[in-house]
Structure formats: C-alpha cells, structure tokens
Amino acid sequence: MNNTLSKRLCLTAMLALGAVVYTTSAFANTSKLIIESGDSAQSRQHAAMEKEQWNDTRSLRQKVNTRTEKEWDKADAAFDNRDKCEQSANLNAYWEPNTLRCLDRRTGRTVAP
C-alpha cells in the first residue's frame, strides 16, 4: 500500500512539474514590437530586381507566343486545306498527311483544290 501511495505521489509531482514547465514555455517574452510598412530599402530593391527580370524575359515570352501562334495557324490552315482537298471535284486529288498537301494521284504534284 505504501508502494502504491508513493507511486501516486511521484506521478502527481511529475504531472504538476510537467504542467508548470508547459505553461511557462507557452508564454513568450514579447518586449519588442516591429512594425514594417513593407516599404523598406530591401523590399524596393527586390521589387526592382523582379521587374528587371520580368522585362528581360519579355522578348523571350513574346518569341514563344509568336511561335505557338504560327504553329497554330499552320495547323489550322492544313485542316482547312484538307477539307477543301477532300471535298474537291477533282477525282485525282488526295490528301497527303505526311506533307499536309493536296496531291494529284497521277503526277504527285500539288493540286489547288
């Protein structure tokens, strides 16, 4: 019985000590207050560097967009030409998918549908 009582007292003491340590660690020393408007020299420099990088990559972005637009226009024109070739009154005209052209079956030359 004495052994059980000492275990309970030891456990209670450990829980109390743990609670004290936990509650004291939860309180932080907040004696300093820093208010920053976001307009520091470092943030201005960072914004200037980002703007410079954005401007430097502008021409590259324009080239990529132009290339994508050209590829789209080429595919769109090929689709239209295929439709015209398949609906052509010329019976010898056929669509060549590898070259994306309308060709004559007899000569192999390009046909205007």
From Swiss-Prot:
Residues 47-59 have a biased composition (Basic and acidic residues). The keyword Signal applies. The keyword Disulfide bond does not apply. Pfam families: DUF1283. Coiled coil: none annotated. Keywords: Signal. Residues 44-67 are annotated as: Disordered. Residues 1-28 form the signal peptide. Transmembrane segments: none annotated. It comes from the Bacteria. InterPro entries: DUF1283. Belongs to the UPF0482 family. This is UPF0482 protein CKO_01577. It comes from Citrobacter koseri (strain ATCC BAA-895 / CDC 4225-83 / SGSC4696).
